[in-house]
Each structure stands twice: as C-alpha cells, then as structure tokens.
Amino acid sequence: NIRLFDTMTVEENVKVGLHNTEAYSTLSGILRAPAYWRREREAHERALELLSIFDMQDLADHQAGSLPYGAQRRLEIVRALATNPSLLLLDEPAAGMNPSETVELMENIVKIRDTFNIAIMLIEHDMNLVMNICEGICVLNFGKVIAKGTAEEIQNNETVIEAYLGKRKEA
C-alpha cells in the first residue's frame, strides 16, 4: 500500500521526512523569523537533491496522488531517505512495477547504498532484483531460515531449490 499524502505535492511529501531535523523554534515558525525561512530554503534544496536521485526533481510541484504507481513507490523511498536513516527497510519495492521500472529501481538501490553508505534490508519476491543487487541473502520458508549466503550460494542451495521449485524426480 502506498503511504503518501496524496493531496500534498511531491516536495511537501519529502519535507515531511525532513521535519525530524527542524532547526528553528515553534515561535520562529509562528513569527516566520529568519531562522524559519533559512530552514525552509534548506529543506527545499535538500528535497530537490533527494528527488534528483530518482530523476523526480521536475515533479516537485505535482500532487503526489496524481503520479503513476511506480513514481509513487519511488517517492516513498525518497521520503524515507529524507529521515537520514542508518538502515533503510524496503518491503517489496518492486511490487507493481514493470520490468523497466524494476531495472531502474535496482540501479537506484545500489546508488542509494553507495552514496548514503547505509544498510538496506530488502524483502522482495523479484528474484532477478534480489540476485543482482544483494550482497547477502537470507531465505525463509514458512517463517524459518533455510539458507544464508551470497546469490551464487543461494542459487545452488538444494534446500532452497526444493522449497521453492519442488523436489527433483529421479529419472
């Protein structure tokens, strides 16, 4: 489910994530003091910088609810990045995306990991995405860990193959 503020702009949605770093008092905000305007200008610049990761800066003034599904998913990730996390949890980020959007998402996840130097925990059923970007993979079957390892180790793990593809028949 998309968890955006549909009637707010793309930029305003990102700024929601930036509010945990407010650098002015409530009184400064009420009075619209110089500290307030300075912080608002910084928030605007930071929001556009984060949006540029997904090449969404030109959509800053669009209403979030009017964006296509894939763009809304990307906006959710940008808003999460605005909180300056040390761990980014992505729960099925490619769900509902077409193949070209998924490829773009893969590139952006790697870019985020490398640029922000943050750990990313990914829960995903798109095995192409998982096998191409994950450094370590943990496979669950009915809530129990059945394998941990690299993409190559997981792809060759008999327990994983049996759990997800079925047992091989003897010829």
Located regions from the model:
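Glycine-rich phosphate-binding loops of nucleotide-dependent enzymes
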Residues: 1-171
